[in-house]
Amino acid sequence: MQSSIIEITNIKKKIVYQTQITLLLVLELNNIHLEYQCRSGYCGICRIELIKGEVFYLIKQPMAALFKEREIFPCCCKPKGNITIKI
């Protein structure tokens, strides 16, 4: 399995990602806690900024209304290679 690096700019932390779980769960397992509610892309509470890289969604498209360009929903996405985020 190929690994990716998740860099979190505002807390100066890097995480090695080698699994098939969501970005939100990876962050939680590394003691980085985000606000969330639905874990399925409907509420939009967990949204964070994607500074660099790409993610893919496990659902067709998050349902949360009016998300901005470069905002992602870690509850229902996974990194496509290395990413840089701001939480």
UniProtKB/Swiss-Prot annotation:
A GO molecular function assigned to this protein is: 2 iron, 2 sulfur cluster binding
Query: Needs which cofactor?
Result: [2Fe-2S] cluster
Cross-referenced InterPro entries, in alphabetical order?
Answer: 2Fe-2S_ferredoxin-like_sf (IPR036010), 2Fe-2S_ferredoxin-type (IPR001041), 2Fe2S_fd_BS (IPR006058), Beta-grasp_dom_sf (IPR012675)
Annotated 2Fe-2S ferredoxin-type domain ranges read 4-87
Cysteines paired by S-S bonds: none
Paste the cofactor note: Binds 1 [2Fe-2S] cluster.
Q: Which UniProt keywords apply?
A: 2Fe-2S, Electron transport, Iron, Iron-sulfur, Metal-binding, Transport
Q: Does the keyword 4Fe-4S apply?
A: no
Binding positions ([2Fe-2S] cluster): C38, C43, C46, C75
State the protein's name: Uncharacterized ferredoxin-like protein BU177
The protein's organism comes out as Buchnera aphidicola subsp. Acyrthosiphon pisum (strain APS)
